Amino acid sequence: MAYPSNKVRGAKLISWQNDLVREFLSLKKDERLVIKKCRQVGCSFTFAQILFYVAINRPRSTSIYITTTNSAARKFFTDMGEFCKESSLVSLNSSLLEMTFWNGSIIYFKSSESQLRGISCKRGGIMVVDECAFLKSDIWTSILPFTTVSKANTLIASTPWTKRGMYYTFYERALSGDPGYHLIDTRDYDLSYFSSEDQREEYRKI
C-alpha cells in the first residue's frame, strides 16, 4: 500500500527504548513482552511509537491499549493525538477514545472501568496493558481473549508494588525464560538522561 503524500516522521528513541522496540519486532505470534519500568523513563512515549508503527505498517490492524482508569486511558489517547492532530492520516474520536488510520487500522483506548466486550486484536494488531500491577485480577478473564484468535502479541508493563497478582506472574515467567515470554527491565539501563526535569522537557520536544 502506498503512503499518502503527508510527511511521516519517526521518533528518536534513547537507551532502553531501542532495546524494547527491537525486542518487540522480534516477537513471534502469541508471545508476550513484559516490561518492568521505573517512573519517568519515557515508557508511554515508546508505547505510543509502537502502536503507531503497528497501525501504519499493518493495514487494517486492530490494536488495544488498556490501563487502570478511564481518565488514564483518555490522557494516553490525548497524548498520542497530539502527535498527529494536524495529520490527515488519522481520525480521532474523543468520545469513544478511538484512533482510525487512513489504511483501515484502528487503536482502541480502554481501561478496567470500560466496557470490555466486542473487541479483539486483528490482522497483526497488538495489546498493550499498562500499569498491569494495579489492575484487578478478574479483568484478565475479559482481556486475555482479545488476543486468542489472532495470536496477537501482548506488551505488559508496570511499576510493580507487590509480589503477587497477574503482573508478577508474567514477570516471573519472563524472568525464568519461559517460552513465549520476554523481559525488559529498565533498571538494567543508564537512566540518567531522564533524571532531571530539563532533560525530560527536552526529550518531550523530540
Model region roles, listed by residue range:
Residues 1-206:
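Phosphate/NTP-binding elements of NTP-utilizing enzymes
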